[in-house]
Amino acid sequence: IQDSLVGSEMCIRDRYKITGYGDYLPSNDWYALMEDGDVRREMITFDNNLIGPYATLPLGPARVDKWPSEGPLNGTDNISVIRLSEVYLNRAEARANLGNDAGAQADVDIIRQRANPGVAAVSATGAALKTEVYNERRAELAFEGHRIFDINRRKQNLVRALDCTSVPEACNLSYPNNLFILPIPDGEINSNADITQNPGY
């Protein structure tokens, strides 16, 4: 399922600018989730011509090319709203939470071995398997807007990577926090006087 968000408040064009000023940035710990040979690492382009603060990321001068387009800006084409790999990972999480370790392992293996045929099968069980599923969601669904919902659903603290330095107060949030609830879009509030903005916005 795909949707074009160009011209809307949810357009990702400015999140993936090829100049290096996009808001979606690769971190060292995310990159390390994937082993050598994993094709998902190829969504990151290292470019010494990048400008701006993102040219000096600890990972190196890198930009996200997950949604490349043929125009002058990345992110102007349709993006996936839901795809099969997310469905597998949703089922893997449900199976792991229900104690069906074999089923969860099989679902994660489908995703991991598609991206890296040489990777070993998942052998973790119990709590360690839940962590494997969570990390696989983070690797596979990166830069698609899922992680904040995953953290919220698991009632976890938000702890950004060690290379989070530009806005220190946003690097760590303890759960619960009103910032885990997203703001209501201005368009919705402006069109209905009975709607009240969520706390903190």
Task: Go through the PLM ranges and name each one.
Residues V6-S8, D38, I79-V108, K130-A142:
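Extended, hydrophobic/aromatic-rich amphipathic alpha-helical segments that build helical scaffolds
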